[in-house]
Amino acid sequence: MKRNFYWKALFSQSGSEIYEISTRVGRFPDTIITNKPLEDLDKINPKLLEKAFDRFIFIPKKPTVEEYREAIKHTDIVTLHGFLRVLPPDICSRYKIYNGHPGLITKFPELKGKDPQAKVWWRNADTPYRLHGHVIHEVIPEVDAGKVLSEKSFQTESLYREFNSLDSYIKRLHDLAIENWVEFIKNRITIPNSFYAY
């Protein structure tokens, strides 16, 4: 029988991805860690604040190894959702940490790093991409270089005909990311009644 896992999630932006995943998984992370300053609460998804603020831990914008350890300790898995810091090697090796990436780096390693959606969009006129996707990979000190554990993809015949803007393409990849995360997390975490997300 699968036991309950303790799940912590980190973000630096709005936390909206965590909220969307949680409502579909049926529970929130046990702890939600952000390096967003308290004065920027208005930039965090209001529904996430309303439903799960008691799970929040605020860390400095540039945490030390000790600050990471204190926030992450006593957990089974850690997921990153728009967390804009490269984690120290000691933290990567100490915990099971997973990150999502909106580029099919298993097929196109050039999409590693920042803004892969824009890379695909702006290069498409010269080098058309017909396979697109989202991956979840283990976090190691090198950016987007950890083992890929889950991926979802879709095909296009013509990117510019099927999407009328970069924003619409990003939205499609975002929806795919939510699907990928939900399946990934459900396969690892059982859902105790006290943690249901509504």
Name every feature range the model reports, one short phrase each:
Residues 1-198:
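One-carbon transfer enzymes
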